[in-house]
Design a protein with these regions (language model features):
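Acidic/glycine-enriched connector segments
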Residues: 1-127
Length: 127
C-alpha cells in the first residue's frame, strides 16, 4: 500500500468482509497516521453484513466503520447477489486492485478477473 500511496493513490475502497478486507482496512487506518491525506472508503454489501459473526469480529468491524472516511451500502438488505454487486461497485470506482488471490475460482477470483477485464492494475500480494 505504501507503494500505491507514493504513486499518488489517495482513496482506498474496502468491502468490509472478514479476512483480507479487514486486514486491508486496518492497514489503511494505520497508514493514515503517517499519510493523513489517504482515505478509507468502506463499500458494504448490506447493512446486516455482520449477521452471524463472532462478537469480537463485529466489534472490530464497528471500530473500522467509525474510523472510515466514508461508508457506502450497495444494498439495504442481504440477497444472494449483494456481494457481487458490492465487488463490482468497488471495481467500477477504482483504477487499482490490491488483492490476496490464491485460488482461481470463487468470489475473489471473479472480482480480480472482472477488475482485469476493466483495465485495472492488479497487485496480488499473495504472489
Amino acid at each position: 500500500m505504501i507503494e500505491a500511496i507514493e504513486q499518488g493513490y489517495r482513496y482506498f475502497g474496502c468491502g468490509g468482509a472478514l479476512g483480507f478486507d479487514t486486514l486491508a482496512a486496518q492497514t489503511v487506518l494505520r497508514l493514515r497516521e503517517i499519510y493523513p491525506e489517504i482515505r478509507l472508503i468502506l463499500v458494504l454489501p448490506c447493512r446486516d453484513q455482520t449477521r452471524g459473526w463472532k462478537q469480537a469480529d463485529v466489534a472490530e468491524y464497528d471500530r473500522i466503520m467509525k474510523a472510515a472516511d466514508k461508508v457506502t451500502y450497495t444494498s439495504e438488505q442481504y440477497y444472494s447477489g449483494c456481494m457481487h454487486k458490492r465487488n463490482r461497485h468497488l471495481v467500477d470506482n477504482s483504477s487499482l486492485c490490491i488483492c490476496y488471490l490464491t485460488e482461481q475460482s470463487g468470489g475473489t477470483a471473479y472480482t480480480v478477473n472482472y477488475a482485469r477485464s476493466q483495465g485495472l492494475k492488479i497487485i496480488n500480494i499473495a504472489e
